[in-house]
């Protein structure tokens, strides 16, 4: 059983400075319901610190739809063209607005995200403030403060990613003063105040004050986690966006930190950072490699405590479960897009098609009229499993005709897709628990999504790809491809084989009595492994993986490889929209996506704004601030 940090409801309820849902989270209030005397010891301050850690994955804070969580599936995936909202059209209309690019600054999810960030920041400031006040009464105030600054840095970096770098930074002095009006994001001349350097300092302080590992408390912050967050901050700070994020040249600092992490870094258990052997084990709670097996760089630790209310879902929402396939109900949100799935189609060399080529293809899954053994026609979702794809697709997305964890083999819509006319014909997969997890203490029998698998915020594969991006900036294109190929090569190790899921196929044959085994079990399919120069027969789909050429690369070829690899490797992990925005290509890419995906969902999408590289600051905050908080440049 893995050691976990328990995110107790009591810690949440007693955190100083925590506001209730619907409050103005920038109206600072350092007073709380617990006296200083109660917290003026090691147990009390750690209790308070636990409340700050809990902000990193708490559905109490983030709303049961997870719109404020660090998983960022709503923004990184759904706004980033990797996922549709799912469910039905009239469910969660604020979510629909984000999915279809028809939102504005009054959107409830956007307000919830803003409030969630600043609630978490207030929790961190409560810890720092109290630790300073009782420094002489606790064992190690500096260690407590370093952890709180790390968490505050994580959340303020999340604020930058979502709302831009000109947002209020709430430090402990502002928190203690309880000032009203709000903390401003502009100076006296009306110029934006960019907070990059303030978040940078939080991570630097955390690096200086945190240990490399902990003895058992694996979810606590370490200096290596802080280094990874700082390196990623430098990468974003250096990225072009659309010229309105006060970007600066920190490529060298990012590069050096990433190289240090690659060469010397170790995870919370002291394991040197590495790519684990099998990609799918990253999302298999029963695998020792799932969490802290060497690939976890920045994880949010999960725990199972036996009931729905005491248990977290890695993406902070209970709504992403399939509607019945796991043996219990589900809402059917968060479905991979046709565009995303097509991006896994590969060419004869096992390399991804260009975006233009992939969008020229039809969907891999379509409705087909099939004739059963009684001679009766029936319309069913059918996937063309002969088209060669990157095997990471079937670990990331559920496809009809391919085994889905231990749930079964999807054959018809019932139990799998709630409304394919709204969300498409694919299912999310990575962060769902298996049915077997319920009996092994890794999930619960009361909810289809809750799981003990960690939320991976930064994996070692991500570090390798971000380092490659720095090398591309330095003009070292062939060297960058070497790191990209490390990530791509691992994909050849893990794929679906028919014999491994014989029981699931047999169950489907027994239940679908009007169809023969030949209608259900694929045959003649292979894994064409060009990485290791071998072919494996008996696979559930045609798979193919090859490596990028290692010589003669240009900025264009290396950049294309990097961007394709980030989408494939990190798909459905909350990254893609942020990548598109910082690269300055969001409008072009997403309007192309609207054109392609919109063919299958007529009149669903609006166009994506040409300057949108961030969300608007919520209208309510602008209104309450009365000029103190100014709307960001994208949304003026």
Mark where each language-model region is.
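Short coil/turn linking the two alpha-helices of tandem helical-hairpin repeats
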Residues: 160-162, 167, 236-245, 475
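Bacterial Sec-dependent N-terminal signal peptides
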Residues: 4, 8, 14-43, 199, ...
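Membrane-proximal, proline-rich intrinsically disordered regions
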Residues: 21-74, 368-373, 385-387, 618-636
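Conserved, well-structured interaction surfaces
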Residues: 41-50, 54-59, 86-163, 184-218, ...
